[in-house]
Amino acid sequence: MLSDKGLLLRLYSQNIDGLEYLAGIPDDKLVECHGHFRSATCIDCGTTADADSVKNTIVKNGTVPECKTCGGNVKPDIVFFGESLPDRFHRLLRTDIQEADLLLVMGTSLQVAPVSMIPDMVECDHRVLFNREPVMKIRTGQDMFLPGDCDDHVQELCSILGWKDDLLKENAKVQIDDSNNKKKAEGED
């Protein structure tokens, strides 16, 4: 919704499940810091592979998929521990930390660097943490910590801003397909 209202500079997500993408966050507004499962690449030659067939090979056979081009190993486009984050993360963060006028931090442990450092890097005056636990230093008079469930706080904030109907419409777009235990956006197959 923030994107639809022209209020989102960028959404940085540590999740690899792609739910932000399915929720309709535009590619130019979304940084999936640790990658996603929507695509896969050969680690030797860089050839892209069908993500669904890679997933099936891993899940059904318990084996590492082979590249059809060079025979190398294919992995989902996710960042494993010890691997570098995508260049796009670093490039966008350099400008975003200067341009943001408000930082919303939601549902995170802030345990994994370099994403954990973003709240301290951002140069804006106000930061709001929606989280079960206080995971960052709160600056008196500048920051706000809202303990509890993120969904509850988002609903309350939308009500205060007069966006409750918009939130209900957005929630209706995303459905859970229990047969696959997979989230799908409206209109996607």
Regions found by a protein language model. Give the residues of each.
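Conserved catalytic alpha/beta core of Sir2/sirtuin-type deacylases, generalized to analogous enzyme cores
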Residues: 1-189
